[in-house]
Amino acid sequence: DSLGSRGLGDVYKRQVGMFIGICIPFLISSITMKAVGDAAFEMINEIRRQFREISGLMEGKADPDSEKCVEIATTAALKKMMLPGIIAVAMPPIIGFGLGAVALGGMLAGGLLGCVALALFMANAGGAWDNAKKYVEKGNFGGKGSDTHAAAVVGDTVGDPFKDTSGPSMNILINVMAMVSLVISSLLPISGMLF
């Protein structure tokens, strides 16, 4: 007696799809957070290079090469977001054709749950860390220069990409996955090609 003959195969496919869907937002948010960190380090290295090589820049007598910094930020933004874009577009066909329409529905449901939860968490946590730093800088809990301020700066360093990059990207992620799923829905097998 197989699972499919008892009608349980679709239940397991739906659960597998939901599990995959819940994992995708966490994967995408980790990629976007790493992308922000990598771009920041590239920018820091460029600024240090300019301070070393452009004479008079430290004293304020020379102008920095701001075009190079803009180029680094633009290139990093475009290149580092290719992988999340590919994942968002490729996962619905992979799940839909591989496991079937039922699993794809589960993936979208799980993706929606994961995206909403992460977006709310990241927007609120990022805003809280940002405001905590501002609160400490107003003189509370020791003010600027204290250990509390140093900890608040670290929190704000994590909080800014949370609320400005990873949180908003969850909306785009679930929208793209849903649109791609709608486009391919008429082509999907009910049961899938793999199982």
Report each predicted region and the residues it spans.
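Single conserved hydrophobic/aromatic residue that forms the stacking wall/gate
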Residues: 1-8, 12
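C-terminal transmembrane helical bundles of large multi-pass transporters
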Residues: 15, 60-104, 108-109, 153, ...
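Hydrophobic core segments of alpha-helical transmembrane domains in multi-pass membrane transport
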Residues: 17-31, 88-96, 111-118, 178-190
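Terminal amphipathic helices with adjacent charged low-complexity linkers/tails
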Residues: 20, 38-45
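C-terminal amphipathic alpha-helical interaction region
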Residues: 26, 30, 82, 97-131, ...
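Membrane-helix cytosolic exit motif
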Residues: 28-41, 122-137, 141, 167-192
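Non-transmembrane, extramembrane segments of multi-pass ion/lipid transporters
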Residues: 42-77, 133-172
